[in-house]
């Protein structure tokens, strides 16, 4: 890749070695011939810009500076105490011990670890964490995401499917270009709030949450690294300097402006006219020259090799850089008209593998019948920030005055129409062959997955709270009971707990299987146990789950601590601790059931792939009046069925409902 300016290299010397390597691979010669330099934010991230953000912020009359105002006050991620972690581990392992001897072996392994390598690794981790506000950040980003080689779709990215707009907004909802205009215009308003730093800090239960993800949300992309590095990178650009989005249509990409030359957001009419032009251009162009997005569906090592080939040509290079620099991507899937929850979920999750650019951090989707959704690349952002964004977008769309909005769309606001620009790529025979291979691999990979949506309308959070339980903990019990009914055993179960109360916090594992959950599912399936005792076991298990999840959110889980300790091992250490090599230790974190909750009254779908090919991925939402789980697995690999789990989820939810209602009636008669 060409170096654009000699000053860049001197700036790079001030960066850490790993950052220099990543940044060096990203320095480019833009078609605009404007030099870009790495600038460090207050959060320690680096973005590429002609001028630092402060230059633009000082010129914004509405700049407030509140979005990131609490960042320096956030606590650093703590290193848990070793004894506490080992004690918690023993509690979580007990349900998987079939006899006393097995559990006693785990106790001996923990004792050996606590007396030998454990304290050494703990001291190393504390020393490593001493000058870092988040000791896990680099390890987690690289090892959990950037070094992961499987295709990021379907295996890493996650999606939201938006509910249809109310009937009185059908003029907007049923016209895909009008709907796309509304989405783009609304997201631009959100971007303006980011530029003004007027977005309020998220406060959860009185605690400010880390807002770092919002500085990394727009004008960013995952980037294939060098083949020899076996690792991807992330690249970030100034949110103030790149006022355009990328539109995907019929497998091609177009640059669509969102602001005028004075940094003023374009009108709805100017956005709509550009979208109309994209569709017109797309219908006239040669489809054989598209399909570049398919390459982002490849395993990462294959994509890195093809990426090198693409970057040899300056035309393709400029087009890729434009996509990376764009605020976000909007995919027009005008040949798709999903109706069922499963159809909508699949289109948002993976689509056709052609009309996407999976490396792009944010992709909104609009289909031919106006159905909309969202796909997120996961490496630098977890779900809560993008949930916030999508909630905002859907909320604003639901508030639109249809007549006023349609008038804005059809009324020209400028005599000079902005013209979108198709992003050209030079497709050599080698690249063409890679595109064909990518599309074949994509179809095969997606074909291995089953997806079924469990949307349960009998009750929701209102009913659960009335019976004194946390809705999240309750649905975890429904899942445990359904799995136990289906497979006659419990499986290691993961629930994501947010640690955003800490600086650059992401997630910790909530272990859903416990002695309490084993007692609950065992008693529930035992016909000799009285209903009152079953309900007591249910409530006790739910309470225990809430306690564990609270500890996890406070940074005091088990799994991230073990992850950190493993990273403290050195090549000259005598041996790997026996605990880390133990089959049961490793089985306990083999997430055969992976779960996570992100809920919105504006979504009718949310999901992602299973974490382990032998298990299920269960993404769930909780509404006041309904429950929703997106069920995904690989049936041929796992030998399990999404349809059967769907059945047992309904059976479990029905039985618990009947038991709670009947117990209430019994008590009322006393």
Swiss-Prot record:
The lineage of its organism: Eukaryota, Fungi, Dikarya, Ascomycota, Saccharomycotina. Pfam families: Carn_acyltransf. The gene is CAT2. It is an enzyme of class 2 (transferase). PANTHER family: CARNITINE O-ACETYL-TRANSFERASE, ISOFORM A-RELATED, CARNITINE O-ACYLTRANSFERASE. A motif (Microbody targeting signal) lies at residues 668-670. It comes from Saccharomyces cerevisiae (strain ATCC 204508 / S288c). The keyword Acyltransferase applies. The active site is at 378 (proton acceptor). Present with 450 molecules/cell in log phase SD medium. CoA binds at residues 461, 465-472, 498, 597. This is Carnitine O-acetyltransferase, mitochondrial. Carnitine acetylase is specific for short chain fatty acids. Carnitine acetylase seems to affect the flux through the pyruvate dehydrogenase complex. It may be involved as well in the transport of acetyl-CoA into mitochondria. Its EC number is 2.3.1.7. Coiled coil: none annotated. InterPro entries: Carn_acyl_trans, CAT-like_dom_sf, Cho/carn_acyl_trans, Cho/carn_acyl_trans_2. PROSITE patterns: ACYLTRANSF_C_1, ACYLTRANSF_C_2.
């Amino acid at each position: 890749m060409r170096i654009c300016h000699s000053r860049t290299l001197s700036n790079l010397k001030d960066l850490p070695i790993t950052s220099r390597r990543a940044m060096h691979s990203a320095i480019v010669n833009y078609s605009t011939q404007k030099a870009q330099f790495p600038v460090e934010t207050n959060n320690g991230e680096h973005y590429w810009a002609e001028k630092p953000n402060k230059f633009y912020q000082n010129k914004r009359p509405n700049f407030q500076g509140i979005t990131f105002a609490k960042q320096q006050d956030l606590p650093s991620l703590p290193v848990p105490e070793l004894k506490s972690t080992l004690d918690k581990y023993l509690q979580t392992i007990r349900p998987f011990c079939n006899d006393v001897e097995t559990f006693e072996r785990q106790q001996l392994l923990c004792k050996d670890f606590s007396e030998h390598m454990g304290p050494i690794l703990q001291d190393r981790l504390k020393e490593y964490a001493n000058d870092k506000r988040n000791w896990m950040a680099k390890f987690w980003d690289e090892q959990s995401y950037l070094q992961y080689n499987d295709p990021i779709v379907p295996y890493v990215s996650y999606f939201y499917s938006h509910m249809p707009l109310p009937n009185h907004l059908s003029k907007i909802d049923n016209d895909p270009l009008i709907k796309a205009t509304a989405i783009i215009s609304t997201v631009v308003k959100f971007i303006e709030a980011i530029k003004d730093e007027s977005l309020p800090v998220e406060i959860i239960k009185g605690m400010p949450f880390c807002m770092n993800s919002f500085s990394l949300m727009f004008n960013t992309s995952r980037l294939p690294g060098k083949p020899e590095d076996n690792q991807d990178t992330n690249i970030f650009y100034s949110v103030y300097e790149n006022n355009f989005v990328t539109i995907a249509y019929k497998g091609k990409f177009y640059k669509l402006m969102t602001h005028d030359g004075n940094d003023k957001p374009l009108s709805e009419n100017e956005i709509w006219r550009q979208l109309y032009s994209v569709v017109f251009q797309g219908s006239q162009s040669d489809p054989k020259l598209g399909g570049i997005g398919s390459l982002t569906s490849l395993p990462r090592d294959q994509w890195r090799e093809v990426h090198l080939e693409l970057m040899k040509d300056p035309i393709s290079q400029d087009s890729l850089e434009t996509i990376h620099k764009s605020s976000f991507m909007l995919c027009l899937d005008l040949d798709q008209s999903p109706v069922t929850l499963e159809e909508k979920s699949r289109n948002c999750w993976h689509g056709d593998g052609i009309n996407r650019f999976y490396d792009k951090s944010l992709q909104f989707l609009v289909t031919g019948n106006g159905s909309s959704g969202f796909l997120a690349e996961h490496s630098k952002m977890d779900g809560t920030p993008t949930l916030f964004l999508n909630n905002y977008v859907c909320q604003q769309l639901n508030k639109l005055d249809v007549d006023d909005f349609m008038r804005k769309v059809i009324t020209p606001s400028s005599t000079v129409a902005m013209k979108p620009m198709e992003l050209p790529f030079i497709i050599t025979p080698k690249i063409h062959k890679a595109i064909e291979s990518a599309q074949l691999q994509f179809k095969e990979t997606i074909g291995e997955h089953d997806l079924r949506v469990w949307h349960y309308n009998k009750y929701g959070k209102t009913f659960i709270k009335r019976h004194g339980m946390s809705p999240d903990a309750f649905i975890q019990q429904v899942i445990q009971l359904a799995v136990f009914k289906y497979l006659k055993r419990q499986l290691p179960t993961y629930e994501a707990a947010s640690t955003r109360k800490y600086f650059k916090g992401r997630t910790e594992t909530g272990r859903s299987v416990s002695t309490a959950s084993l007692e609950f599912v065992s008693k529930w399936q035992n016909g000799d146990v009285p209903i009152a005792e079953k309900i007591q076991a249910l409530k006790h298990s739910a309470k225990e789950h809430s306690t564990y999840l609270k500890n996890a959110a406070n940074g005091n889980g088990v799994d991230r601590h073990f992850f950190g300790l493993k990273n403290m091992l050195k090549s000259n250490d005598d041996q790997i601790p026996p605990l880390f090599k133990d089959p049961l230790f490793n089985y306990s974190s083999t997430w055969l059931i992976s779960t996570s909750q992100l809920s919105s009254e504006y979504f009718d779908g949310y999901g992602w792939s299973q974490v382990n090919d032998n298990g299920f991925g269960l993404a769930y939402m909780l509404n006041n009046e309904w429950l929703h789980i997106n069920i995904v697995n690989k049936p041929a690999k796992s030998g399990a069925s999404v349809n059967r789990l769907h059945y047992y989820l309904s059976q479990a939810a029905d039985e618990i409902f009947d038991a709670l209602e009947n117990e209430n009636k019994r008590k009322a008669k006393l």
